[in-house]
Every structure is written in C-alpha cells, then in structure tokens.
C-alpha cells in the first residue's frame, strides 16, 4: 500500500500529464529508436510500454528503428569488417543482404513483438512494403576534396515517401514500426540512415514531434555539457569546430530539416533513461536538446 507522500507524488505526476494528453491528442509523434534503448532488456520494455501508453491516450506514435549494433555483431560473426564514411555505413551487395536480414527480420520483428506483448498492435514494415519509401543512390562529398563524390554502395537517400500506408495504419489503431530500407525505381534496395528516414517521415506526416533517442543526454559541447537548445547558426558553428561529427551529423541534419519543414518540436534525448519518451512527451521536465529552425 502506498504511503501518503508517495501517493501524492504519483497523483501529481498523473495530473501533470493531463494537459499534454489533451494537447497531443490525435497528433503524430515520430520516434527514432536506437542506441542502448534497443539493447538493454529493461530499457526495451520501458520503451515498448511508453509507446503503447502514448497510443492508448490518443496519440499516433510512429517508430523508425536503427540496428547498427546488431548489424555489426553479425558482420563480425561472418568475418566482415564494417566501414563508415561521415556516419554512413559503406554497403556492398553482401552487406546489404545482411542489413535487410537484420533490420527487416530480426530487429523489426523483435520491436513489434515487444509492443504487442505490452498491449499494443504493432505492424512491422520496411520501405518495400507498399513501396512507400522511394530511394536513390547516395553519393557522399569527399571532405578533403569537395569536388569529388564518393560511392558508398547500396546506401540511399530518400526521393519520396508515400504516407498513405502509415496514415491507414494510424487510423486503424495500429503502431507502425519501420526499418529504414528504401527501394529505387529499378527495384534496387537501399540502406538509409534511420535518422534521415525518421526526419523525412515526420515532415511528410505533418508530425507534432520528432524524437531521436541516443546514447548521450542530448547534444554536448566540447566540455561534455548538455546543450538544451540549438539554432541553425549554432549547429553550423559546432560542425565547423568539430564538436559535431560522425554519427551525430546525420542526426542533427535530419532534426534541423524536420524543424525547418514545420515539425513543431524536434528533440534529441537520452535513450538510456528509463521512460525517457514519457518524460519528454507527458511531463514539464523536457529532457535532451531541442532543435529549432530559427
């Protein structure tokens, strides 16, 4: 039985959530799920229950997931070394087969199962399903020689997204869980950065929020201090001085593009915190870094 103090604290937390439930009712929230939240068993359960709760109180969560650690694990088992250029995985034909198997099979199905086990109705998808993520080959600019473009294999950029399948699932009380694999006009599949897919989906769906889960408290400065808010000018400065690099680059770029396209709030938050999703959406204590377009 709860003592009076604990009961009052729980009641206060529930009361605090009410205005946010009203505000975000029937709104779309796109969540990029990655990092430790995908590998720690307890955090996985927390994430799944958070997503189900958001759906039950009337919001439309859409989950886009990565799977880098799982891909690396299988590549290591097969004796194949992974390589990254500017945060993008170099993807030859053999690696693409592995990416599709891990993302579209193992990881996607595990997330769907977790959400369903917690009382939700999740549906797993890749961009091949309904041909809803259209892609083309991505060439990366050589930072040492900007006039040179680097071919990194079957890595794609989004050429278009058809939102009708996601909207149909939302209207049927399903929770879409999306692996970031796109399809070219010739049927070629492409590995697309999950942050990029999440950002573009948020834009196309007219999402109220885009939330990117990471393995850090948010965006940090060179001294390790959390930056609670960032503007485009501040982001440019952080890239120029090397504070932002590697895997954080596509994350920041996608967040900024989404903010500029009209997504009302874009957050990079710490996925290592229990129920980080609920803390961000349903409490006054916003966590992480807020990206704004101005």
Curated annotation (Swiss-Prot):
Stretches that traverse the bilayer: none
What Gene3D superfamilies is this protein classified in?
Acetylglutamate kinase-like
Q: Which gene encodes it?
A: argB
GO BP terms: namely:
arginine biosynthetic process via ornithine; L-arginine biosynthetic process
> What function does the entry list?
Catalyzes the ATP-dependent phosphorylation of N-acetyl-L-glutamate.
| NCBIfam families in UniProt | argB
Q: What is its EC number?
A: 2.7.2.8
Q: Name one GO cellular component term.
A: cytoplasm
Q: Under which main EC class is this enzyme filed?
A: transferase
A Pfam family reported for this protein in Swiss-Prot or TrEMBL: AA_kinase
Which InterPro entries is this protein grouped with?
AceGlu_kinase-like_sf, AcgluKinase_fam, ArgB, Asp/Glu/Uridylate_kinase, Glu/AcGlu_kinase, NAGK-C
Q: What is its main location?
A: cytoplasm
UniProt keyword terms in alphabetical order: Amino-acid biosynthesis, Arginine biosynthesis, ATP-binding, Cytoplasm, Kinase, Nucleotide-binding, Transferase
Say which species the protein is native to.
Methylobacillus flagellatus (strain ATCC 51484 / DSM 6875 / VKM B-1610 / KT)
What is the reaction catalyzed? N-acetyl-L-glutamate + ATP = N-acetyl-L-glutamyl 5-phosphate + ADP
Q: In which pathway does it act?
A: Amino-acid biosynthesis; L-arginine biosynthesis; N(2)-acetyl-L-ornithine from L-glutamate: step 2/4
Which residue positions does UniProt flag as site: Transition state stabilizer?
32, 251
Which family, according to UniProt?
Belongs to the acetylglutamate kinase family. ArgB subfamily.
Per UniProt, subcellular location reads as: Cytoplasm
MF-aspect GO terms: acetylglutamate kinase activity; ATP binding
Identify this protein by name.
Acetylglutamate kinase
Annotated residues that bind substrate are located at 67-68, 89, 191
